[in-house]
């Protein structure tokens, strides 16, 4: 078919990673944060053992040992401090320096959803998120940095200046199944925004 499978199945052990390596060109596992503080009482990851930073870091490291390209990233705006964001970026950088398998870092702003316990959580401000994107580029100057444009429909052009070089998957055929309330921008519009910033758009 010409399709290149990319599976994001969360926290997998080495055997599971090895099995997926046979049929996937790359895998995905969002670190989200390296802060174990966020697994504490009344914190976002209290009841999510699969999102424990140690478990996620183990996946990234095991993928590195198996020479599996992997995409990871941070979720910004779930209660982390700026220092914790920097620490998380450094963790990703160190894993990539050791194994060279991190192919992309996604900087994703948290968008509160109805019917969740964090529905009243304030999303990160544009200035804060722009700062975190800039920090990702400073800490990892040669890394592919992505921001999903549909989660910042009014601001996404500014992330080019902050250092991103990838818009991620934008589909003219399907919705964003993870964030169905956030429609994709028109690809022609994204291309125009990219070209106006002085860069070539490659789809």
Regions found by a protein language model. Give the residues of each.
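Anion (oxyanion) recognition and catalysis
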Residues: 21, 64, 195
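Conserved hydrophobic/aromatic pocket- or pore-lining residues that grip, position, or stack substrates
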Residues: 29, 63, 92
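Structured alpha-helical segments in the cores of large, soluble enzyme domains
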Residues: 55-65, 129-133
């Amino acid at each position: 078919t010409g399709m290149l499978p990319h599976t994001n199945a969360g926290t997998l052990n080495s055997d599971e990673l090895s099995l997926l390596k046979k049929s996937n060109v790359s895998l995905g596992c969002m670190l989200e944060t390296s802060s174990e503080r966020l697994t504490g009482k009344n914190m976002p990851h209290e009841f999510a053992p699969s999102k424990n930073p140690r478990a996620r870091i183990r996946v990234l490291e095991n993928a590195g040992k198996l020479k599996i390209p992997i995409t990871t990233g941070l979720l910004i705006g779930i209660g982390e401090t700026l220092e914790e964001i920097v620490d998380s970026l450094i963790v990703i950088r160190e894993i990539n320096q050791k194994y060279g398998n991190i192919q992309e870092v996604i900087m994703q702003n948290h968008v509160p959803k109805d019917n969740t316990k964090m529905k009243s959580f304030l999303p990160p401000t544009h200035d804060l998120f722009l700062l975190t994107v800039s920090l990702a580029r400073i800490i990892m100057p040669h890394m592919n940095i992505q921001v999903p444009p549909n989660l910042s429909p009014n601001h996404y052009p500014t992330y080019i200046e902050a250092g991103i070089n990838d818009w991620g998957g934008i589909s003219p055929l399907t919705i964003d199944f993870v964030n169905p309330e956030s429609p994709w921008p028109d690809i022609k519009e994204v291309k125009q925004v990219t070209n106006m910033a002085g860069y070539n758009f490659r789809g």
